[in-house]
């Protein structure tokens, strides 16, 4: 039998003065050169347990052994010294730094010179030495990324590779991955699973937290179940079916949630998007010129004149294409988006009616985020592009859209959904605090807020809320998501916009949220669902549109849009 890599005995950890018990007498043993997964519902204590192993939290009681040595970690620095590394669900990267700087941050190589009693380190970074080590790691583990690119310009999958390289750069032998595939596309997930297999071949020990049971079945050997903070058993993956794993994790049988209705559009649309252009280049100057150009073309067409590209746009594109253009000027033009940037002038158009779930399928990075931003008001569209109940809301503020009856659950819940250092109660009403139900004459009605919050907590099973008094940061990621979804589904909205709504949720919570979305459909809400999970779209959508490179290629009924058809459109 393999040697024990580490074991944790009778680990207890609580928060909020003991009111939230995250781990209760948890035992975990993981062997060297294995992939061991932690399974459990949202809030079961998985992330807390691994955070204790990585030194981010100190246990209230219990023991940790690395091999046969008992250790006491006061910080993550102590864990790193024992060759433990962790890749968090929410990446810990500095966006404005390069990949190289992010990898070496906190573990920099420096120049040194011979001195009387050894070597004297100079306050100068030895970047070439660090870069050479990282290049060798990338070749060895087949983890390639541009070291000189800024992190802000990387895809989510590439950012994850940077996090993995950070861990490897510190020579970690025990690697912890917390929900590593929650934000990845299908292709990136395949790549990640291959990385895990390579790590095992090279002798690494992997601890994997994931709710995606098919992925666990592919790479893991053993699993430990956590339920409400307790460890309830360990089993061999190869001897256990996916259905059985789900039952063990939830403690009950799961019912399939599926949209079995046939939708027929009636009346005027709730949301109408008309010839909306998605400029995938993030540069504000490019968007300004592109929209100015489109406006001019529309005016010429109305006047019956031939369409002509704006002279400034043509000139900038010409500079990028001409070989005689000085390199530094061409570089500036390319950075502005007028070189290799491909322009898509077709425009997106679709309608969503009452009682309809309209889903948008596609690989991440094809314009989904831009579309959501324009509908929700994070970005302003050109006039007469976005209509809600017949009113042009293209230039409405976010507040005005919320007051009109639009609710949204956006992909980045920490940035757009929650104020992490406030209570559950505050977050339950923070975008509707001006309603008479919750405040009058600038005084908050704390009783009504508490009652309303408790309804959301009970109805949506938000665990660890402590009757709404808990700080949101202390909730698990899945329970944070359930709080946001509960808030938006409890409000009187006519349009609900969901982006990656089940990201990071366990299988039971996913089924529960799907049912709540179907209930909202029955109540005649119009629903826009943007998801990278094809199974989710096929299970609950009425109408499916496929987005590719900023264009909506096809919109059709669920019965027509088979998995194969959607796949072909995505790959075009």
Curated annotation (Swiss-Prot):
UniProt superkingdom: Bacteria
Keyword RNA-binding listed: no
tRNA processing as UniProt keyword: no
GO CC terms: plasma membrane
Subcellular location: Cell membrane
Boundaries of every ABC transporter domain copy: 6-253, 327-572
GO molecular function, one term: ATP binding
Positions in coiled-coil regions: none
Keywords: ATP-binding, Cell membrane, Membrane, Nucleotide-binding, Repeat, Sugar transport, Transport
Residues where ATP binds: 40-47
Protein family according to the UniProt entry: Belongs to the ABC transporter superfamily.
Described function: Part of the ABC transporter complex involved in carbohydrates import. Probably responsible for energy coupling to the transport system.
Protein name per the record: Putative carbohydrate transport ATP-binding protein MPN_258
Organismal lineage: Bacteria, Bacillati, Mycoplasmatota, Mycoplasmoidales, Mycoplasmoidaceae
């Amino acid at each position: 039998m393999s040697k024990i890599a580490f074991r944790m005995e009778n680990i207890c950890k609580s928060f909020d003065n003991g009111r939230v018990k995250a781990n209760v007498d948890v035992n975990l043993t993981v062997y060297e050169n294995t992939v061991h997964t932690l399974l459990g519902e949202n809030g079961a204590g998985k992330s807390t347990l691994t955070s204790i192993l990585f030194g981010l939290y100190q246990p209230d009681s219990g023991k940790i052994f690395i091999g046969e040595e008992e250790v006491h970690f006061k910080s993550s620095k102590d864990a790193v010294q024992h060759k433990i590394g962790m890749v968090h669900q929410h990446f810990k990267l500095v966006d404005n730094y390069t990949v190289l700087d992010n990898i070496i941050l906190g573990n920099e190589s420096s120049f040194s010179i011979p001195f009387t009693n050894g070597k004297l380190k100079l306050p100068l970074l030895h970047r070439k030495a660090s870069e050479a080590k990282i290049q060798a790691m990338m070749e060895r583990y087949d983890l390639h990324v541009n070291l000189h690119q800024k992190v802000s310009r990387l895809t989510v999958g590439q950012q994850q590779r940077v996090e993995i390289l950070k861990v490897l750069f510190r020579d970690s032998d025990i690697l912890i991955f917390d929900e590593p595939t929650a934000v990845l596309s299908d292709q990136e997930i395949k790549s990640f699973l291959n990385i895990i297999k390579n790590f095992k071949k090279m002798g690494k020990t992997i601890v994997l937290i994931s709710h995606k049971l098919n992925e666990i079945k592919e790479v893991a050997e053993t699993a430990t179940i956590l339920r409400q903070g307790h460890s309830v058993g360990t089993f061999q993956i190869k001897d256990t079916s996916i259905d059985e794993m789900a039952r063990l994790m939830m403690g009950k049988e799961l019912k399939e949630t599926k949209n079995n209705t046939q939708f027929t559009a009636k009346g005027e649309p709730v949301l109408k998007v008309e010839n909306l252009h998605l400029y995938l280049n993030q540069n504000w100057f490019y968007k300004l010129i592109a929209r100015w150009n489109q406006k001019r073309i529309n005016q010429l067409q109305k006047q019956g004149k031939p369409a002509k590209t704006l002279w400034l746009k043509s000139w900038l594109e010409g500079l990028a294409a001409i070989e005689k253009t000085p390199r530094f000027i061409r570089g500036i033009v390319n950075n502005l988006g007028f070189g290799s940037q491909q322009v898509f002038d077709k425009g997106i158009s679709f309608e969503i009616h009452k009682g309809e779930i309209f889903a948008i399928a596609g690989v991440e990075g094809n314009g989904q985020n831009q579309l959501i931003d324009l509908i929700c008001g994070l970005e302003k569209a050109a006039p007469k592009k976005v209509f809600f109940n017949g009113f042009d809301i293209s230039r409405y503020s976010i507040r005005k859209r919320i007051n009109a009856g639009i609710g949204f659950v956006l992909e980045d819940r920490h940035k757009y959904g929650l104020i992490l250092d406030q209570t559950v109660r505050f977050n339950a009403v923070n975008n509707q605090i001006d309603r008479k139900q919750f405040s009058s004459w600038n005084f908050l009605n704390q009783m009504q807020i508490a009652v309303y919050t408790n309804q959301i907590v009970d109805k949506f099973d938000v665990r660890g809320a402590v009757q709404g008094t808990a700080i949101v940061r202390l909730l698990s990621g899945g329970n944070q998501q359930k709080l946001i979804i509960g808030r938006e589904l409890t409000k009187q909205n006519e349009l609900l916009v969901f982006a990656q709504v089940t990201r990071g949720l366990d299988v039971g919570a996913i089924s529960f949220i799907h049912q709540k979305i179907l209930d909202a459909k029955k109540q005649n809400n119009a629903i826009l669902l943007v998801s990278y999970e094809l199974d989710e779209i096929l299970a609950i959508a009425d109408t499916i549109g496929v987005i590719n490179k900023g264009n909506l290629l096809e919109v059709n009924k669920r019965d027509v849009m088979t998995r194969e058809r959607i796949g072909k459109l995505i790959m075009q």
